Amino acid sequence: MVSEAITALKERTGSMLTQIKKLVAAGKLTK
């Protein structure tokens, strides 16, 4: 159970990081 929760959290944070990177890249392109 614990390991499953940790992996789920890692996947969520990873997807969030990728989304943030995309937003940052888009912001740099528009500037």
UniProtKB/Swiss-Prot annotation:
InterPro entries given in the database record = Histone_H1/H5_H15 (IPR005818), WH-like_DNA-bd_sf (IPR036388)
Entry GO MF terms: DNA binding
Q: Is Transmembrane helix among this UniProt entry's keywords?
A: no
Q: What is its main location?
A: nucleus
A Pfam family assignment? Linker_histone
BP GO terms, sorted:
nucleosome assembly
The protein's location, in the record's own words, is: Nucleus; Chromosome
Q: Give a Gene Ontology cellular component term annotated to this protein.
A: nucleus
Top-level taxon: Eukaryota
Which keywords does this chain's UniProt record carry?
Answer: Chromosome, DNA-binding, Nucleus
The record describes the protein's role as: Histones H1 are necessary for the condensation of nucleosome chains into higher-order structures.
Per the record, the similarity remark reads: Belongs to the histone H1/H5 family.
What is the name of this protein? Histone H1.3
Which organism does this record belong to? Answer: Triticum aestivum
